[in-house]
Each structure stands twice: as C-alpha cells, then as structure tokens.
C-alpha cells in the first residue's frame, strides 16, 4: 500500500479516535460487555446524551455492537466488535505513554 492509499484511511482512523470520549469509551469496553449505565458510571464526566451519540457513531463505524437481550425488562449491552478489539494494543500504548510522559500535576 502506498502513501496516497494510506492517508485517507489513517485520517479516518484518527478522525474516529480523536472524537471526544471515544477512546475512553472503547477503553472501558475492553473490560467486556457493559450496559449503558455501567459505562456512564465509569465515565462520570460524560453526559448520557453524549454517551448515547458516541455509542451510535461507534456502532455505525462497526467498532461497537449493541445487543438487545430479550428479558423482562429488556436489557441492552454494548461490546466491542473484532474491529473494536483490534484497538486494544493502540490504547494500551497510549496508556503507557501517558503514564510515562503526562505530569500528574497538570491533570484537572
């Protein structure tokens, strides 16, 4: 694959991951299937409206899968697809980089 073929794909990947909250949502789902309320509780600064939008976007991109479990009441769980799970090493490296290079005194 030459540079001109890779650039649009790379740009799309960065566009997806750089959207606010996306990387943190994916990172959270690396722990396994979760309900909306579990994701929301794990990311307390993320509003329910934005979480809902991001999950829909990630579902459209094929990164997240939404499973409806036919119980009473109906249960909905979100999990990563193979495409989403493939982000694990990337997010792991970002986590290592942050641990080494981000000064805790600059965090909110």
From Swiss-Prot:
Residue ranges annotated for the HTH hxlR-type domain, each copy included: 7-106
GO CC terms, sorted: protein-DNA complex
A biological-process GO annotation: negative regulation of DNA-templated transcription
Pfam family, one: HxlR
PROSITE patterns: HTH_HXLR
InterPro entries according to UniProt: HTH_HxlR, WH-like_DNA-bd_sf, WH_DNA-bd_sf
Origin: domain of life: Bacteria
Keyword Plastid: no
GO molecular function: DNA-binding transcription factor activity; DNA-binding transcription repressor activity; transcription cis-regulatory region binding
Intrachain disulfide bonds: none
Entry annotated with the keyword Disulfide bond: no
Keywords: DNA-binding, Transcription, Transcription regulation
Full protein name: Uncharacterized HTH-type transcriptional regulator YvaP
Native species: Bacillus subtilis (strain 168)
The organism's taxonomic lineage, starting at the top: Bacteria, Bacillati, Bacillota, Bacilli, Bacillales
Gene for this chain: yvaP
């Amino acid at each position: 694959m030459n540079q001109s073929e890779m650039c649009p794909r790379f740009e799309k990947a960065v566009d997806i991951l750089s959207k606010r909250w996306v990387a943190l949502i994916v990172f959270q789902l690396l722990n396994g299937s979760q309900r909306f309320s579990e994701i929301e509780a794990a990311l307390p600064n993320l509003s329910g409206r934005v979480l809902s939008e991001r999950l829909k976007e990630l579902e459209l991109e094929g990164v997240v899968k939404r499973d409806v479990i036919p119980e009473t009441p109906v249960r909905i769980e979100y999990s990563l697809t193979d495409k989403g799970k493939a982000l694990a090493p990337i997010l792991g490296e970002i986590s290592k980089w942050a641990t080494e290079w981000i000064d805790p005194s600059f965090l909110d």
